[in-house]
Amino acid sequence: MEILVLNLGSSSIKFKLFDMKENKPLASGLIERIGEEVGQLKIQSHLHHDKQEVKKQLFIKDHASGLLMVREHLTKMGIIKDFDKIDAIGHRVVQGGDKFHAPVLVDEKVMQEIERLSILAPLHNPVNLAGIKFVKTAHPHIPQIAVFDTAFHATMPDFAYMYALPYELYEKYQIRRYGFHGTSHHYVAKEAAKYLHIPYHKFNAITLHLGNGASVAAIKDGKSVDTSMGLTPLEGLIMGTRCGDIDPTVVEYIAQCANKSLEEVMKILNYESGLKGICGDNDARNIETRAKKGDKQAKLAFEMCAYRIKKHIGAYMVALGRVDAIIFTGGMGENYPALRESVCEGLEKLGIALHKPTNDNPGSGIVDLSQPNTKIQVLRIPTDEELEIALQTKRVLEKH
């Protein structure tokens, strides 16, 4: 069985083609800067006999043009003989709202719901839907499955997902906390339980997905019971360009003081804040280098980021009662030892203690970063959202 996973962003397409007999990728690729003057195309074959790679810089008009390039290169590179022979396509869809608590086979009703939910994810759901529509038009017989970022968090209790706003706002407009990065949190939690030989339905963990977008999840008995993101991905941790938790009155105050419209203020909070807002850069590598050289703003940004993560760990330890593991994943969580060290520093009395030599040089794959005989295991686990989407796609396909 061959499954193609598509992850369409506002100006990008990320994809992986899997052979589901062994859950191994046959090819992967990334198309970036769609709609800009010079776009980028990168496709890599993972076939044992042929590890060829294609890199191009060219104008890519829109997502449909990008998807045509994906189809063309998968066949031209000999990765697949016929695109129509793909068994299914799994789509990452960011917002599933109250409607979708699990992956679903796409039909007209599902497409209408994804479009309706675009008001909650205006940057993501419309392009996710564009990918679905492209496949439906070009290859109508290929089954498509939508896998929702929010679905894993559908198990949160109402006292965790509700905002203390007039209840009618929830009833009329579904204003509540949904959470995101669910596919990643789910994947690394399953991998951790397997690694620690704990039955997943008895596994308690705090998962830290730390990248340019970042979130924490509290997982109890294998289910999400709380997470840091809310109605949108703006809530929670300090991120690359997003502010995370702030006093809501700040929005009105900025608008008045700086003479900004609501739209302009929201742009500041989403694209000009977070690490970038504090030190002018959202690249963790640059920030770490600058901080080591004594740059005060870079040091402040780093400390603020780590402190916010640490506060969420403490809160979720209380929510869970028992914690088997703390799991670092995502670009920053996997690759920046200094951030992991700063987050775990001072938590020894809670049973969290890093083994510094291992943390500094963890190697590849799943790594136990904790000191021997500590109460809570600290793990570094590379996430694989595409594989998790492929696995969920396969399960839905087998049911139908």
UniProtKB/Swiss-Prot annotation:
Residues reported in the UniProt entry to bind ATP: 14, 209-213, 283-285, 331-335
Cofactor requirement: Mg(2+); Mn(2+)
Keyword Transferase: yes
Sites annotated Transition state stabilizer: 181, 242
GO terms for cellular component: cytoplasm
Residue numbers binding Mg(2+): 7, 385
A Pfam family hit: Acetate_kinase
EC category: transferase
Protein residues bound to substrate: 92
SUPFAM superfamilies xrefs: Actin-like ATPase domain (SSF53067)
Cofactor: how and how many bound: Mg(2+). Can also accept Mn(2+).
Localization per Swiss-Prot or TrEMBL: Cytoplasm
Alphabetized InterPro entries for the sequence: Ac/propionate_kinase (IPR004372), Aliphatic_acid_kin_short-chain (IPR000890), Aliphatic_acid_kinase_CS (IPR023865), ATPase_NBD (IPR043129)
Catalytic activity annotation: acetate + ATP = acetyl phosphate + ADP
CDD domains membership: ASKHA_NBD_AcK_PK
Active site positions, chain numbering: 149 (proton donor/acceptor)
Keywords noted in UniProt: ATP-binding, Cytoplasm, Kinase, Magnesium, Metal-binding, Nucleotide-binding, Transferase
EC annotation from Swiss-Prot or TrEMBL: 2.7.2.1
Gene Ontology MF terms: acetate kinase activity; ATP binding; magnesium ion binding
Chief localization: cytoplasm
Keyword flag Magnesium: yes
NCBIfam families: ackA (TIGR00016)
Function recorded in the entry: Catalyzes the formation of acetyl phosphate from acetate and ATP. Can also catalyze the reverse reaction.
Family membership noted in the UniProt record: Belongs to the acetokinase family.
Record note on quaternary structure: Homodimer.
The protein, known as: Acetate kinase
Organism the protein comes from: Helicobacter acinonychis (strain Sheeba)
